[in-house]
Design a protein with these regions (language model features):
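Conserved residues at beta->alpha junctions
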Residues: 3, 106, 126, 150-151, ...
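Cofactor-binding loop segments of dinucleotide-utilizing enzymes, especially the Rossmann-like FAD-
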Residues: 2, 62, 151, 179
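A charged alpha-helical hairpin associated with nucleic-acid processing machineries
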Residues: 54-56, 96-103, 130-146, 153-315
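Phosphate-handling DNA/RNA-contact segment within nucleic-acid enzymes
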Residues: 8-142, 146, 158-160
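Conserved alpha/beta enzyme-core scaffolds, especially Rossmann-like or related mixed alpha/beta domains
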Residues: 1-7, 237
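Short, surface-exposed acidic
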Residues: 1-2, 20-28, 33-37, 205, ...
């Protein structure tokens, strides 16, 4: 569900204190803010209000979008005892019940609202923050298949790459749904899931969902897009960068398959690409060993967990 906060500085404050809640309780809950003169005012004013509900069904905070053109456009509850944006996903209380085989991870709460209204009850959002280890642990309780559907601007592309890096050694099967840019007055502008559904409809989104790339294909395409593969120097640079990605893949079969595809893209033999990946793999192992040695020599670092990649064995 959703609601709205009135265009008032103290409507919630007056209502809640009238019902017996103290100002300190409202402050602790992130519903009011203290000013410099010692007074208090409502945090959320003239906003569309979206309750954030945890997987147990409890309201733990709020997301919001301004109704007029004032700033900030989006605002969430501040960190509280019950609400930590690193540890919660908007819409997961509903998406955990989906019959679909995967969960769609979006950027914004309104993306989730629109997708659910369109029949995609497997959509969640990361509350305006980059995907965190804590959120992936939460997701792993309900699915092993993720579809990343971030905005198609530069920030969204960067968020996708960071999420893929975080999920690289996880047990998730990860795909990327790339939303096309929208042509308006001769210029291409960004588009999010909310925009796309409203303009193109659920069937068009379903087609994009079915055609989602896996995470490795997406990252390889991003790397290839940086280089003119008709130029020899660019091809060499591409091979060096893509080999680092391929060397990070956990499975030998997976490395073999994508090494062949990278070789084809670069116009070289699979054997030459394989040698480049092997060199990158050896450099990667050497870097990890040096990092472990530095950690062992530093007492403070030695206290940190040695395994930094994502694992779910203890969940």
């Amino acid at each position: 569900g959703m609601g709205a906060s009135p265009d008032s500085w103290d409507a919630l404050l007056r209502t809640m204190t009238g019902r017996g809640y103290t100002k300190q309780e409202l402050l602790t809950a992130g519903l009011i803010v203290a000013n410099k003169s010692g007074g208090f005012y409502d945090k959320f004013r003239n906003r569309l209000m979206l309750p954030v509900i945890d997987t147990r069904g409890d309201v733990v905070g709020f997301g919001s979008r301004v109704i007029d053109n004032s700033e900030p456009k989006y605002m969430n509850t501040t960190e509280t005892i019950t609400y930590s944006k690193r540890r919660i996903l908007y819409g997961l209380n509903l998406a955990k019940k989906t019959k679909r085989p995967n969960i769609i991870l979006c950027e914004g709460n309104l993306d989730v609202v629109t997708l659910h209204q369109a029949g995609f009850d497997n959509a969640v959002a990361s509350m305006g923050t980059a995907l965190t280890v804590e959120q992936t642990r939460l997701l792993s309780r309900f699915t092993k298949e993720l579809v990343l559907c971030y905005d198609n601007d530069n920030a969204g592309q960067l968020a996708t790459q960071r999420a893929l890096e975080l999920l690289n050694n996880s047990e998730f099967s990860v795909k990327v749904l790339q939303l096309p840019r929208r042509l308006v007055d001769g210029e291409y502008i960004k588009q999010d899931a909310d925009d796309f559904i409203k303009l193109q409809g659920p069937d068009a989104f379903e087609r994009l969902l079915n055609g989602s790339e896996n995470g490795v294909e997406f990252r390889m395409a991003q790397i290839a897009g940086k280089y003119d593969l008709k130029d020899d120097e660019a091809r060499i640079a591409y091979c060096g960068e893509v080999s680092e990605l391929l060397a990070s893949l956990p499975g030998a079969v997976e490395r073999e398959i994508y090494t062949g595809r990278a070789a084809e893209a670069a116009g070289i033999t699979a054997e030459a690409m394989k040698l480049e990946v092997q060199r990158s793999f050896k450099r990667r192992i050497a870097r990890e060993k040096r990092a472990e040695l530095r950690k062992d020599l530093n007492p403070a670092m030695a206290l940190q967990p040695k395994e930094r990649s994502l694992r779910f064995e203890n969940m």
